[in-house]
A protein has these predicted regions:
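Short hydrophobic, aromatic-rich alpha-helical segments embedded in or entering the lipid bilayer
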Residues: 152, 174-178, 206-210
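Long extracytoplasmic/lumenal interhelical loops at the membrane interface
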Residues: 184-222
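A juxtamembrane structural motif centered on a specific transmembrane helix
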Residues: 264-290
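Re-entrant/interfacial helical elements at transmembrane boundaries that shape
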Residues: 99, 195-199, 230, 272-282
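Hydrophobic alpha-helical transmembrane segments of multi-pass inner membrane proteins, especially
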Residues: 1-171, 213-271
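Extracytosolic (periplasmic/ER-lumenal) interhelical loops and adjacent juxtamembrane/interface segments
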Residues: 171-190
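Transmembrane helix boundary and interhelical junction motifs in multipass membrane proteins
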Residues: 92-98, 191-195, 206-208, 277-279, ...
């Protein structure tokens, strides 16, 4: 069953990679439409990866020799996972990072050998540095990719802008400013009240990427703190239930899905308060379509 889910995931990712559509003004084609329904294949891939990795580790948990067989690693674990990662990342770097981070969390909980994890970390870090260096050395070679967007967002976050931002990143900068303004307004009493936000008219993704700041503006900083508290309670409850599960597969699936949800929540709130560069992550359970 996990192989069927993974193959379906790879198929939809290929579809989005080749002919993905744009929804809500986002520049990256992350969506596909099937029978009139639109969805992001990357979200489906996160679930597929969690189940796939959990099944592999559960299957070979008592036989380390088979688990570390190069043939099995290439065909039954790393190959499909890396293929999904490569298909996700060009259109959605933040989801790609959540994908690979969650994968490593599952490996750690599943007692995958640390030596292999550290080696793969080193390879990923080296690849990232090489990509960054290659872009800085020859930006024109990456003009038709999203690499300039990624680098610009990181550079503009850590270094004061030199006025050379693209139109897309200027829009993102304005949205972050509006989000911070909404949070600042929400820090005062009384708050704007339900449905009475002003900054939502300046945020093109007010109901998704910046919903947290709008909620703070409408329900005050207390409302924002309550939302964060709900996620903390959710984390504690799922963690307790995960370690009550008797089989390794169930434990890894619960921990993996929890990791995905909490990564999205942390990144979303971090972007809204200006702590991390702009991404396109929704607030789980709350954002429109989240």
């Amino acid at each position: 069953l996990t192989w069927i889910i993974v193959l379906l995931s790879i198929g939809t990712l290929l579809w989005a990679f080749v002919s993905g559509t744009v929804i809500g003004g986002q520049s990256a084609g992350r969506w596909v439409r099937i029978f009139g329904l639109s969805f992001q294949p990357s979200a489906f891939a996160l679930i597929a990866m969690v189940m796939f990795a959990a099944r592999y580790l559960e299957k070979y948990s008592r036989d380390t020799a088979k688990m570390l067989s190069w043939k099995r690693l290439a065909l039954d674990l790393w190959g499909p996972v890396l293929l999904m990662f490569v298909l996700i990342t060009p259109h959605n770097l933040s989801t790609g990072l959540i994908f690979i981070f969650t994968f490593y969390v599952i490996l750690l909980i599943g007692r995958y050998p640390l030596r292999h994890i550290f080696i793969s970390w080193a390879i990923f870090a080296a690849a990232g540095l090489c990509l960054y260096g290659a872009y800085k050395a020859n930006p024109e070679a990456f003009k038709e990719t999203r690499v300039p967007t990624w680098v610009a967002r990181v550079d503009n976050f850590f270094v004061k802008s030199d006025g050379k931002m693209s139109q897309e990143d200027m829009d993102k900068y304005r949205q972050v400013t509006a989000a911070k303004t909404a949070i600042a307004l929400g820090g005062t009493f009384p708050a704007a009240g339900p449905g009475k936000s002003i900054q939502k008219y300046f945020l093109s993704q007010a109901d998704s990427d910046f919903i947290f700041s709008i909620l703070v503006e409408e329900y005050s900083i207390v409302g924002g703190a309550f939302i964060l508290l709900l996620f903390v309670v959710f984390t504690i409850r799922v963690t307790v239930q995960a370690f009550r599960v008797e089989d390794l597969f169930g434990l890894l699936v619960l921990c993996g899905l929890l990791c995905v949800i909490m990564c999205q929540a942390i990144i979303h709130t971090g972007v809204n308060v200006g702590m991390i560069p702009v991404t396109g992550q929704n607030l789980p359970f709350i954002s429109s379509g989240g």
